[in-house]
Amino acid sequence: VTYIAVYRLLNELLKDKFGVETTIVDTTDIEKVKAAIRPNTKLIHIETPGNPTLSISNIEKIAELAHANGALLSVDNTFASPFNQRPIELGADFTVESLTKYINGHGDAMGGAIIGKKEYLDIIRAQSQINLGATISPFNAWLIMRGSVTLPLRMKQHNENALKVARYLKTVKGVSFVAYPGLEDHPKHDVAVKQMKNGFGGVLSFGLKADHDTYNRFVTHLKVITSAVSLGHDESLIVFLGENDERQYLYPEEFHNGFFRFSVGIEDAEDIIEDLRQAFEKENLI
């Protein structure tokens, strides 16, 4: 599972406009990745943790598989951030980072970065960047550079808060599931521990034992947490997802009836948990 804009880029734009063939595969299962490789496969792209299911793919094993078959590996590292996970050190050829999210960290600038060997980046710069115009504005670049200075401090707090919130959510009777790689019962927790050296990031997903109307009412009760898209900001953001999503067939079954993606901010963890608690209480979910 990957970010919906990337999903559409791979399945629609590149396919329809440029004739690039794409195979969608569950990259948490190395055998499925192996089975999907074709003689003309040039690139394997993964996102780990995955958006929005928090699935974990084994970067080292997929890198070995890609290189054994003459392909390159790119890793979208947005949910982890470079503070927690460094894919190139694990064998990836490219790391893709959304500068908009954790690296900037304040929700006030947009940008992206590709990290890799100079021989590849020179081609990207000479062809894609110049011809397609994917260049960041000077002001956005300045904001992101300013925000990046505090990345380690912020990520430590995101990591700590998200784990506390995930553990709290596991105790709430009205919560149907919690997806967070830092929880011991996450199906790929052992892989996450190995490749996410400093923590598991600030994003988690959870479902409610409730109907759609309850989801809608729940967010209206929140006072500290903001109901909004995006993630990786200093403030906590929550968004309802899952219904009418073309990627739903890729989701585990528990995600099919809708769920919240929760980007846990750097507010005091007790304030975040209390905000959730009082909202749950108003909907008789605790």
Question: What are the roles of these predicted feature ranges?
Answer:
Residues 65, 164, 168-172, 217, ...:
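Generic non-transmembrane alpha-helical segments
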Residues 122-124, 214-216, 272-274:
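Short acidic, gly/pro-rich beta-turn/loop elements at beta-sheet edges
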Residues 1, 10-12, 16-17, 35, ...:
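PLP-dependent enzyme catalytic core of the Aspartate aminotransferase-like
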Residues 1-174, 179:
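Conserved PLP-enzyme active-site core in the AAT-like
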